[in-house]
Design a protein with these regions (language model features):
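Polysaccharide-binding surfaces and accessory modules of carbohydrate-active proteins
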Residues: 3-5, 9-13, 17, 31-263, ...
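Conserved, mostly hydrophobic/aromatic
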Residues: 18, 164, 288, 334, ...
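Glycine-rich, aromatic-flanked loop segments that form ligand/cofactor-binding clefts
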Residues: 72-74, 79-117, 242-261, 299-324, ...
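Short Pro-Gly-centered flexible turn/kink motifs
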Residues: 98-105, 283-302, 730-737
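Aromatic-lined carbohydrate-binding/catalytic grooves of carbohydrate-active enzymes
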Residues: 325-462, 475
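Active-site neighborhood of glycoside hydrolase catalytic domains
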Residues: 392-394, 426-428, 432-589, 601, ...
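C-terminal beta-strand-rich structural cap/linker in extracellular carbohydrate-active enzymes
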Residues: 703-741
């Protein structure tokens, strides 16, 4: 790992054993994009990668250089209005009404390690030897605006972390109207755009399409990262698959409004950008103030989509997630929501807990309805005190009874919201985001608290800290069940209302930081009506997230498959739920529900007391199996093998760190008759090691399993006979492969 500056060509080269990032100071003083990809040997002379040509019908920076138009030059920080007519990465409104900037290279420095980003989540290092950071300073002399571009390269992995700081060293007020965390110009357009898209209950489905001239973009203006579009995109070569081919991806470590775009120009250049959504954003930067953008993490891979994912998984699991629970296997939990909804008593909860404890469950989670006047979703949010009619012995009393049964205790909260029917709203109606004289839109009968205000965040912190102070609560599910509308703060002047969306997220991060610091033993799981704020920013505070409100096994296979493009299995909340499923009314086998949920944190969301004796025995076996192998599921190396978006059969697998144990999940959506012979090519095994299949006892070498494949042929091949074992729709199997010593 090194960062080298070549003075002759004014070229910076960041590189490690696997990746290089090269940029240069351009003749006009800005920064140019030269290369990002496989590691190149360092040398003088990379400036030949800077290409320019005269283009007709354009404007040029220098009067005597007809071939120097910014519209035809690859740049790192394009700005508005000076011969580049593509999308800018920085747009600053000045007091005279101009948005023109001429950012000139001023200086540079290299720091060992990686600096923290003030008030924002970001990847980190535990030792300065793990990374180096290049900080380049640019200055616009007329305004006094100083911009610092931060580039971090890690000792291991194919990732580059980027962000930007804007400092007003001038005498006039500036308005930041667009501040991208990342902008890079790529020298060709032979890419397909891969995004994770969807909606509530079908989050992060994989969609892929060719780039074309013009702009391809995703984003969110909902006040949260959203289930419609995840803050992640990958540019993949057309021939790229899960196992081979080139990928260039970007993931934004942010939980609020964002935009990502690829602009393909008319001369074969692709501009890739990611950052805070510029619509509804206007940040006043007074003299002496600094604005820090969120971090964007670039990843390059020549080992297909799985190679890209492995880089994100390792980085986000080890150097984005933090705290006590980062490296711990997660407790097997039961959540009462789909078992009771709001209709519960302490007696009913303890009855569920009794059966759960007998099955080996480790954590009992009490969901919505335990606080304030909360007997439905019409009241109570904002009043974080126990409802004595529901829990006559309080949270601590119930927790002690749960602990006496051998389990830990957790609760559900929704700290960012308030019902109008609540003591908090009646006392502070100005604490909600709303515009005076206009209607307040409601979602799930609730309003959004103004987390851009410190007094609001302080109040919620004090309420929550009082609940957690006894130490009886060991897990918190932090929900958020509506998007932001009427985004107007009663505490800010008119000129600063464009800051509210971002200040809200900063307030959210502040509350998370204070609670996780004060109560480090608590496992926080983020949630937003399922996976509608499943993003890297949340993983910095909560090492796992509820992946989707849709707990149907078949739907979850697509959701978890897509989520794994960027996020590790240890971050995915995954539960076995009741059938018929409450979201899609589908009936799936119990073993398929478990086989799907294993590839995540694992838990149950149903009343175990309503299961048959045979089903209870199966649940006990499932829990025992997960306890034996959860280290591999949650912290092993994950591979996607067959896509549910392309095939009737899906497969994925986890491999232990020493590569001596592998667990393959195989799932068929619809049953077939007289089907073909079937096999699945595996990955990540030791080629010369003999593995034994725990299902059949068959033994195969790793190279055979990876190149020929694991044979999955069953009774659907040929005419079905009962003696061959009848199969059904929504069937699944697990194959545990152990190295033969």
């Amino acid at each position: 790992m090194n960062i080298v500056y070549h003075e002759k060509g004014k070229v910076f080269h960041l590189f490690n054993d696997t990746v290089s990032y090269i940029l240069m100071v351009l003749p006009h003083g800005g920064l140019g994009s030269l290369y990002f990809g496989a590691a190149l040997r360092d040398r003088e002379g990379f400036e030949h990668l800077f290409e320019r040509a005269h283009r007709g019908m354009t404007a040029c920076v220098f009067a005597d250089s007809r071939d120097y138009s910014l519209d035809a030059i690859r740049q790192e920080l394009p700005t508005y209005g000076s011969s580049d007519f593509r999308r800018p990465a920085l747009n600053v409104l000045q007091e005279n009404g101009s948005r023109i900037l001429d950012l000139q290279f001023k200086d540079w420095r290299v720091e060992d390690g990686k600096p923290k980003l003030a008030g924002l989540p970001a990847t980190y290092v535990e030792s300065p030897s793990e990374a180096k950071t290049l900080i380049i300073t640019l200055e616009d002399a007329p305004t006094g605006l100083c911009v610092e571009l931060l580039y971090t390269i890690f000792a291991e992995g194919n990732a580059i972390a980027r962000s930007m700081r804007c400092h007003n060293a001038g005498m006039e007020m500036l308005h930041l109207q667009k501040v991208m965390s990342l902008s890079i110009d790529l020298p060709d357009t032979d890419y397909e755009w891969l995004e994770l898209t969807g909606a509530w209950a079908r989050e992060r489905h994989v969609e892929r399409r060719a780039l074309a001239t013009g702009i391809t973009a995703i984003g969110s203006r909902r006040g949260h990262s959203s289930g419609q579009y995840n803050p992640f995109v990958a540019l993949v070569r057309p021939e790229t698959t899960e196992m081979q081919g080139e990928v260039l991806a970007v993931s934004l470590v942010y939980s609020g409004n964002f935009e990502m775009l690829a602009e393909v120009d008319n001369h074969g250049v692709t501009r890739l950008q990611a950052g805070i959504h510029s619509t509804d954003f206007d940040w006043t930067l007074a003299t002496g103030e600094t604005f820090q953008t969120p971090e964007a993490v670039l990843v390059w891979s020549d080992e297909g989509l799985n190679g890209m994912s492995r880089t994100y998984h390792r980085l986000y699991q080890r150097r984005l997630a933090r705290g006590t629970w980062r490296d711990k296997v997660r407790p097997i939990l039961i959540n009462n929501w789909e078992a009771t909804y709001f209709d519960f008593t302490e007696e009913k909860l303890l009855a569920i807990a009794d059966v759960a404890a007998q099955c080996g469950v480790e954590l009992f989670v009490l969901d919505d309805g335990w606080f304030g006047a909360r007997t439905s979703d019409h009241a109570g949010l904002g009043d974080w005190t126990v409802n004595p009619d529901r829990l006559p012995n309080g949270i601590d009393g119930l927790a002690e009874k749960i602990e006496a049964r051998g389990m830990k205790f957790g609760i559900w909260v929704e700290l960012e919201m308030v019902n109008e029917d609540s003591d908090l709203y009646r006392a502070h109606p100005d604490w909600v985001l709303s515009v005076p004289g206009r209607r307040k839109s409601l979602g799930r009968s609730q309003c959004v608290l103004d987390f851009s205000r410190q007094d609001v965040v302080d109040n919620i912190y004090e309420q929550m800290a009082a609940i957690l102070a006894s130490g009886k609560v060991s897990y918190v599910k932090w929900d958020m069940n509506r998007s932001i509308t009427e985004c107007w703060s009663h505490a800010l002047p008119a000129a600063r209302q464009g800051e509210v969306f971002h200040r809200y997220i900063l307030g959210l991060y502040d509350l998370y930081e204070r609670l996780t610091t004060a109560f480090p033993h608590v496992l926080f799981e983020s949630c937003a009506s399922g996976g509608n704020r499943f993003d890297p920013g949340m993983l910095y505070y909560a090492p796992q997230a509820w992946t989707s409100d849709n707990s149907d096994a078949v739907e979850r296979q697509k959701i978890q498959y897509g989520t794994s493009m960027c996020y590790p299995l240890s971050s995915m909340g995954s539960h076995v739920s009741v059938v018929p499923n409450h979201q899609v009314n589908r009936v799936t086998p119990l073993h398929t529900r478990a086989n799907t949920a294993y590839f995540g944190t694992f838990g149950y969301e149903l009343d175990l007391g309503k299961l048959s004796a045979e089903e209870i025995a199966e649940v006990k076996d499932e829990i025992a199996f997960m306890k034996e192998y959860r280290e591999i599921f949650q912290f092993g190396t994950f591979y996607r093998l067959q896509s549910p978006f392309e095939h009737n059969v899906m497969a994925w697998m986890c491999v232990s760190g020493d590569q001596k144990t592998a667990i393959v999940g195989w799932y068929r959506t619809l049953n077939r008759v007289n089907d073909r012979f079937a096999r699945v090519r595996l990955a990540g095994l030791l080629p010369d090691t003999l593995y034994e299949d725990s299902r059949s006892g068959a033994r195969c070498y790793g190279d055979e399993l990876m190149h020929y494949g694991l044979i999955t042929t069953d009774g659907t091949t040929g005419e079905p006979h009962p003696e061959d074992g009848l199969t059904t729709d929504f069937d699944s199997r697990l194959y545990v492969l152990n190295a033969v010593e």
